[in-house]
């Protein structure tokens, strides 16, 4: 066990994690040069295209160190984006060390800090690495200073490297061996292995990625998952060197995969503990009694309705969501019926990027045509009878008379940016009802801390932040509490009928403005009908904005040449009566764009 090192790489988006992982794999001979592709561990097309890492991947490598010993290194790649911080904490809890990669030309950014604190909380040894040293604008001294100021770990011996040219890779590997402690655990004890990740494979069923903590797991063993108490046979074991390499057994301290003929992913919950059942011996000596401390169940922060464009596609959408959930433990969904859109699902996501990626994967990998409603967050509603309910869907909030108060989720937001953009960012944060808590200067970087309602961030805060700071600002946020706030539900009515999927929750101070904006937008989108269509925005029974789409009408008096006015009036009255009848029975088609229009109402 002393020759095993488990480590992962943490960094902000685009600081070069995946390229560094490629170099390390190449240096340890995990892949021949001809198989080397950029970003080996990003296996999803979407990951390569967006240049981000979504799922954690692993590689088991052998490295001959300068002291002549051969070490087994397990590298676990982690995502850098704030929405996937959960994937990061899972990867880190399987490691003893982490390489903190900082772009020497950019310095410390928000997710670097967030992920680094996660690592320090889990007691992982952090080794700072300065990447992109080949760039002419690299400023290693400044970057070291920032690491010490902002994160507070000693960066005097930070390793300079360049993942692009391959400089400093050996130094990194030597540092991992020297500074990262070997795994602790009892190789002779009862088997305990933690599931770090699990995904579904069409041929073999569920594949579990496990980190063996105590004991050993051999091929053919009967295993039990402690949380669900389900039992299986370990049919195949192995490690990824990024390729799959079958093994006869996995020892304590190793990270590898187990295939046990599990049919549904719900059985192999991430964070569960795997242990042995020995046939015939009562299984006591080999079965662990105490599970490993797992992960906290992750709570989705952002909700949106996903509906199929054709009602007949409902079943295939459900299958697609089930399959996606196999690979993505943090996706939540439940069936929902909307009067406007028919049958669909209410889905919970970790954040906006996560939502976009789920939508894109549904459309790409599963060929779904989707209608998505505006994203919303969870509100706590204190009803007049004292009951507290959590509401994910704005249209489900009870009428104003039955509600004592609505509490909205407040998050603590950390914003990092160069000094020049502080003013613009502060203006933006105040617009979004942010309350400034703190402001700190670290060299040329400024860190602002705000409390903001999550509902304000969900719509477009991130995009706006990037545009006011020319892309230099970065952010991360964490949930703080639910707090009572003067928010109201704005309903959109078409000809007096509520369209439930268009309800939005906004702060009272912005309600009239948002109502007007949405109504005006809807007027542009809904096509003209044979009768007048009134589009109204209402808070309860109080109408705050209205637009009318005028009816298309035939010129009924074209056939009268001259003649009496009463003849013309008769025809016009007759037309009017017909339109009135039509309006009573006519229904208005709401096009798909209307649901997205709510998102694009400009501030």
Swiss-Prot record:
Reactions it catalyzes: GTP + H2O = GDP + phosphate + H(+)
Report one GO cellular component.
plasma membrane
- Main location per the UniProt record: membrane
Enzyme class at the top of the EC tree: hydrolase
Q: Which domain of life is it from?
A: Bacteria
Where in this chain does the record put each tr-type G domain? 2-184
- What is the protein's name according to its record? Elongation factor 4
Organism whose genome encodes this protein: Polaromonas sp. (strain JS666 / ATCC BAA-500)
Tell me the name of the encoding gene: lepA
């Amino acid at each position: 066990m002393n020759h095993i090192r488990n480590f992962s790489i943490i960094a902000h988006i685009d600081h070069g994690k995946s390229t560094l992982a490629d170099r390390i794999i190449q240096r340890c001979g995990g892949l021949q040069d001809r198989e080397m592709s950029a970003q080996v561990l990003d296996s999803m097309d979407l990951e390569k295209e967006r240049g981000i890492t979504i799922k954690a991947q692993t590689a088991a490598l052998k490295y001959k160190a300068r002291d002549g010993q051969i070490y087994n290194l397990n590298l676990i790649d982690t995502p850098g984006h704030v929405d996937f911080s959960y994937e990061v904490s899972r990867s880190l809890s399987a490691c003893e060390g982490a390489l903190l990669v900082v772009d020497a030309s950019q310095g410390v950014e928000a997710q670097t800090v967030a992920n680094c604190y996660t690592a320090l909380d889990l007691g992982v040894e952090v080794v700072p690495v300065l990447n992109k040293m080949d760039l002419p604008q690299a400023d290693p001294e400044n970057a070291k200073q920032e690491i010490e100021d902002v994160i507070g770990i000693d960066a005097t011996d930070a390793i300079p490297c360049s993942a692009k040219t391959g400089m400093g890779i050996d130094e990194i590997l030597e540092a991992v061996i020297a500074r990262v402690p070997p795994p602790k655990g009892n190789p002779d004890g009862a088997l305990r292995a933690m599931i770090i990740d699990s995904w579904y494979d069409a041929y073999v069923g569920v594949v579990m990625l496990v980190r063996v903590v105590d004991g050993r797991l051999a091929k053919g063993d009967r295993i039990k998952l402690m949380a669900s108490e389900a039992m299986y046979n370990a049919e195949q074991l192995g490690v990824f060197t990024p390729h799959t390499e079958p093994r006869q057994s996995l020892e304590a301290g190793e990270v590898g995969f187990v295939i046990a003929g599990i049919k549904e992913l719900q059985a192999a919950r991430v964070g569960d503990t795997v242990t042995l059942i020995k046939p015939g011996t009562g299984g006591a000596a080999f079965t662990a009694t105490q599970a490993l401390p797992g992960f906290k169940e992750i709570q989705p922060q952002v909700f949106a309705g996903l509906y199929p464009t054709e009602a007949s596609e409902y079943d295939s959408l459900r299958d697609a969501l089930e399959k996606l959930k196999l690979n993505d433990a943090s996706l939540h969904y439940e069936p929902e019926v909307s009067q406007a859109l028919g049958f669909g699902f209410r889905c919970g996501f970790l954040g906006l990027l996560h939502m976009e990626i789920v939508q894109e994967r549904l459309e790409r990998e599963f060929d779904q045509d989707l209608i998505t409603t505006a994203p919303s967050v969870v509100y706590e509603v204190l009803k007049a009878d004292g009951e507290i309910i959590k509401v994910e869907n704005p249209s489900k909030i009870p009428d104003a008379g039955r509600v004592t108060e609505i509490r909205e989720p407040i998050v603590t937001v950390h914003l990092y940016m160069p000094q020049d953009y502080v003013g613009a960012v502060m203006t933006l944060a105040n617009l979004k009802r942010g309350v400034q808590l703190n402001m700190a200067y670290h060299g040329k970087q400024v860190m602002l801390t705000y409390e903001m309602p999550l509902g304000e961030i969900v719509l477009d805060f991130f995009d706006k932040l990037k545009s006011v700071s020319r892309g230099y600002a970065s952010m991360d946020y964490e949930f703080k509490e639910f707090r009572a706030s003067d928010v109201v539900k704005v309903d959109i009515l078409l000809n007096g009928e509520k369209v439930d999927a268009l309800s939005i929750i906004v702060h009272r101070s912005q309600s009239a403005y948002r109502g007007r904006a949405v109504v005006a937008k809807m007027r542009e989108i809904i096509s003209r009908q044979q009768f007048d269509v009134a589009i109204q925005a209402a808070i309860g029974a109080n109408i705050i904005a209205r637009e009318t789409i005028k009816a298309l009408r035939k010129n009924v008096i074209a056939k009268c040449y001259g003649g009496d006015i009463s003849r013309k009036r008769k025809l016009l009255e007759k037309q009017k009566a017909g339109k009135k009848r039509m309006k009573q029975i006519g229904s208005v088609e709401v096009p798909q764009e209307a649901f997205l229009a709510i998102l694009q109402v400009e501030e």
